[in-house]
Amino acid sequence: EIMPSLVGSEMCIRDRKKRRLNMNTGFIKVSAVSPRVTVANVEKNLQNALKTVKAESESGSSLIVFPELYLTAYTCGDLFLQDALIQSALDALIKFSKETAYSDAVICIGLPLRVSSRLYNCAAVLQSGAILGIVPKTYIPNYNEYYEKRWFASSEKVNCSSVIIDDEEVPFGSNLLFTLSSGAVLGVEICEDLWVPVPPSSELCLNGADIIANLSASNEAVTKNDYRKNIISVQSAKCFCAYVYASSGVGESSTDLVFSGACTIAENGAILSESERFAFDGSSASAFIDFEKLNSERVRNGSFSDNNEILRENDFTVIPAYVNEAEYDNVKRSFYPYPFVPSNESERELRCGEILSIQSAGLAKRLAHTGLKKAVIGISGGLDSTLALLVAVKAMEMLSLPNENIICVTMPGFGTTDMTYNNAVELIKALNTTFKEIDIKPACLRHMSDIGHDSDIHDITYENTQARERTQILMDISNKVGGILVGTGDLSELALGWCTYNADHMSMYGVNCSVPKTLVRHLVRFEAEKLGGEIEQILLRVLATPVSPELLPPDENGNIKQKTEDKLGPYEVHDFYLYYFLRFGTKPQKLLFMASRAFSGKYSEEQLKEWLRLFIKRFFISQFKRSCLPDGPKVGSVSLSPRGDFRMPSDAEFTEWLKF
């Protein structure tokens, strides 16, 4: 029998030399494993566990999680009341610890342990030949097919804080946390603990854990797998944590139940990896956890901190168990290149419909509030103004107002091409909106003459003269007809400062202000497919048009010469940077690594590095434009509204962000 330590509540934790981390990448490789298990054959299970640790350690795993009661098997029944089985499990744990001393990985393995005349269902946490701690199960199921209270006591019955195993004092309790790195902390719970309304993992996370290991023995039943994955996913989302779940496999007794060896790894609501089920030779799942992203989520979510302050307990014991973070080259994790756009087609369609509803409802509310019944939009034949027009049409429908109440103004300038002009005119007429055309060239020439600027010098003054002339016209028409000037600029342009201050930067309500360029395309395409016919053909031509402000004259063939992406780089790359930079505060070196994976084979690392530098510089120097943005609706998790989502001084330096 394991006796409680005489130390009582005072924890004597052995001195452990803190390992020097090889790299501050923010990634840790974790594995949930369910090797072949044999009921009551401890030696065979031990050997399988040793083989598994060797394989996982060689693959670079820093955390290896076995199933519940793995050393004995979960389905031993009343054999748990036999001294021979309990002693064999303890002996196996000691041997397992010594024979895995070569591994720096933190290992969680399940076994029954008797302490002070009570039997506990436990998870042992080991590293480098040392047993770091023993965590007993808290919630002991005793319903339906479960009869665990027949054998096991809850951690609530524990009356000691450490035990002696192999002449070493080992922390014992459900209040243990294990530091894996400078930013990652491990907490442990067992099977049923997850299925209660307030799992121990919630408390563990509030006290600092951001990776949860669950050693489980979850039998299969129809629909149970989906439900199980759902609660794993939801718990990881609620707690902003990674969840590493390993369940017993088909080697368990099939007298009444069948176990599948389900292994699942989730991170902040997303399933990163899951194993094959019902594999006779065992199963496993591995993933690279981005704990820096989890920490960022917690820092940004005020309610998590509030919950922490209200419910946090102060009697948790933190045990050092430092592991190496994965080097970037070894991180086997892919990154979807379009984080603003769902990869699944059906989900993408639902998202597009919802975003358009948010945009149009925002505009409709503003019109209703002001009592104005008309909307004024400058239509260029490009993507952004096209989307704004489609939103305005839906807003009018909400308000039961005719499309004629949308005043569409096309304002040809020095860079306007026949292609964009025709797209604009045809779309305005096809949607039955009110068409108005004003040639801005005479006014711009007069203005440049007034300020003494040579109109043959095509510099920033030449370009911005046109942009501000257009905005002045639109503002005045709005006053004249009693309407709202609808802004067309998108989130990507705001991030890069690709707008003229007090020109297209300004409006009375900006419907696209939190829609990035990559998403604008999908929204327009979604509406094209929905509307069909002539309108669809016009919208498809708009989608095929290069992105351009058209402020410089066309080439000799009348085609667009000034192409935005030739100057800035691809919007798909900038949107990728924008999402992770704002959403998670991702550091530039890591951002470059992620982009290299996301756009592998499409852009070189040198190109991505050049565009990242450009993104950072333009993002910082353009904050003054974002500090005075018009109102506009937030549609997703990333927004640059100075009133809500993003507050930054306009004169901040970007030097620290260029150190990569």
Model segments located where?
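Enzyme catalytic cores with a strong preference for nitrogen-chemistry domains
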Residues: 18-378, 394-403, 435
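ATP/NTP-dependent adenylation/nucleotidyl-transfer catalytic domains that generate, transfer
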Residues: 29, 45, 182, 240-241, ...
